Amino acid sequence: MGSKRPDRRGFIKSGAALAGGLTFGAAAPAIGQDQEHHGPSMIKEGKDQIAYGDRSKHVTSVRIAHGGRPSPDNWGLTFHIAAPLQDSVGVITPSSLHYIGTTRGSFLPDIDPKEHRLMIHGLVDRPLTFTMDDLKRLPSVTRLHFIECAGNRSSRRAKNVQETHGMTSCAEWTGVLLSTLLKECGLKGSATWFVAEGSEEVKGASSMPIAKAMEDCLIAYGMNGEAVRPQQGFPLRLMVPGFEGIFHTKWLRRIKVVDRYYINYNDFGHLDQDAKVAALDYQIGPKSVITFPSAGQQLPGKGFYEISGLAWSGGGAIKLVEISTDGGKRWNKAEIKGTAQRMAHARFGLMWNWDGKETELLSRCTDEIGQIQPSREQIAKYWNKPYDQTFSVPGLDNSIQPWKIASDGSVTNGFA
């Protein structure tokens, strides 16, 4: 079966990690007083490093172009860029590694925050225009939220978790609730939808229900303790917690309140959809993925490991994560690290004693409203499609991702 699940208390009592229980080798002995020990070489810091810190040269995690398009391309357009989930720790994605999503491709706007304005108009009593200073004078909130691109799905060609699931990230966002601004403007009785527009060349815009705006949408000017990065929408980004990434409008400049579903570029593809597809086009379903061990990684030998990964859902907080170490025959409850936040990544882990045999790892999650992450077989049944056609189903794909572990410790995509 490829594994034994250790008792947590027994694992600690056995002192496996300190007594050579990790069969690929015990920790090196401490250096004795009679042994010569040389400290590390010193880094000579310059003014740039003092002004804004660098990471260590030994840390090499980088984003990669996603979906087969070079980015930037020969014209300088940026397309999809995936985050290195395989190297992530905790739940917050560093701003410099946060994924980038743009279906059409975009040039990066160079916006002077002193000149930037946010206009709110349409079916409101008082159309208003806000400067950045105006927004920062209003009551602020700080919340942890993920964003995920609708194209974040596995394929048989994907070689690692960055290629299968790298189009999601989680950050701490600070700003003003959209409901605060809409209350200031005053909504007319016929207001049922709103349209958010960005400042990029094609004026990216999306239509959303006004109920969502009044619930938890955030006009963010801060990200991970500093200003929102230009690639993430500086100086303003609309955060729509739990909705697919295309609704999180970057370089936000205008919100129009309307009384019907508004036709624009981003929403045009939704017009022909039946209810079954449309239901999957806003809220992200429960989803999880094991980031270690995952495809492209190598286990050095049998013994104890902590299986680790991320889970998230547009339906709220993650309440349960389960892991199978035998291809789905049995499921074990994983530990959720810390307190899971609503519409945010949750880090999970499970101690595992690998016996060195070939096996398959899976994870699945359940959110606070009871939604359970489906298998690919369940996806096929839902769409009434053959299994082989489920990799291109409409809407969002939140199916379980398998990782195969060979007897030599190599890890590969279970769909390959």
Map each language-model feature to its residues.
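Generic cytosolic/nucleocytoplasmic N-terminal low-complexity/intrinsically disordered segments
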Residues: S3, I12, I43-G46
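Sec-dependent signal peptide hydrophobic core
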Residues: G15-A19
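Structured, non-membrane catalytic/scaffold regions adjacent to prosthetic-group chemistry
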Residues: Q33-A416
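N-terminal secretory signal peptides
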Residues: M1-G10, G20, F24, I31-Q33
